């Protein structure tokens, strides 16, 4: 029989309650690392009730000094109608370049534009490969936009000084959003 710090013996019910309470406290929140380009370089925990989803996409073929659009596609578990209404918090875009990529590459997230060249003039933040950290961080720019509107109204724009082959850049977008609603029970008769 174990004893508590006071020296009194705990009965089985008290031991089980103590173990259960410790288990409930072990909740790990995903972390958005605030990029160095934003000036603070401090890792931030997501707010309570929020989680982070990563969207990863490869680039299409890009001609030299041309801007192309890359659409944002929701993962399957968020494409359910109930989850499309979840509100967005912060967004981070990170660039992953192959060693063969030459010249400056820029990426931004804005509303869909008629002319892709206009996108960088309206962007709140731009991930630039010529900077120390190729990332863009949107703190309040798209706050409280739903995930459905994020997919429908926003687009990632990519600019390259040199011509790029397809799949030579990985664009990773981390979106902090309200926790999704999962179906917790299954019934074959429902």
Swiss-Prot record:
Keywords: Capsid protein, Ribonucleoprotein, RNA-binding, T=3 icosahedral capsid protein, Viral nucleoprotein, Virion. This is Capsid protein. Residues 1-20 are annotated as: Disordered. Capsid protein. Probably binds RNA and plays a role in packaging. Pfam families: Bromo_coat. The keyword Phosphoprotein does not apply. One of its GO terms (cellular component) is ribonucleoprotein complex. One of its GO terms (molecular function) is structural molecule activity. It is found in: Virion. It comes from the Viruses. The lineage of its organism: Viruses, Riboviria, Orthornavirae, Kitrinoviricota, Alsuviricetes. The keyword Isomerase does not apply. Belongs to the bromovirus capsid protein family. It comes from Broad bean mottle virus. InterPro entries: Bromo_CP. Gene3D superfamilies: Satellite virus coat domain (2.60.120.220). Its main location: virion.
């Amino acid at each position: 029989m174990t004893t508590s710090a006071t020296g009194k013996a705990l009965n089985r019910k008290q031991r089980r309650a103590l173990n259960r309470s410790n288990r409930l406290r072990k909740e790990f929140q995903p972390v958005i690392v605030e990029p160095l380009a934003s000036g603070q370089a401090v890792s931030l925990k997501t707010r309570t009730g929020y989680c982070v989803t990563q969207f990863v996409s490869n680039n299409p073929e890009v001609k030299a000094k041309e801007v192309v659009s890359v659409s944002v596609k929701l993962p399957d578990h968020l494409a359910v109608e109930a989850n499309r209404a979840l509100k967005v918090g912060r967004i981070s875009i990170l660039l992953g370049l192959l060693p063969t990529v030459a010249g400056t590459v820029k990426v931004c997230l804005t509303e869909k534009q008629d002319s892709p060249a206009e996108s960088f003039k309206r962007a709140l933040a731009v991930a630039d490969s010529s900077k120390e950290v190729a990332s863009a961080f949107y703190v309040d720019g798209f706050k409280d936009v739903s995930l459905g509107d994020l997919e429908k109204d926003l687009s990632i724009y990519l600019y390259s000084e040199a011509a790029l082959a397809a799949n030579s850049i990985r664009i990773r977008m981390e979106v902090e959003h309200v926790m999704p609603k999962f179906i917790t029970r299954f019934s074959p008769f429902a």
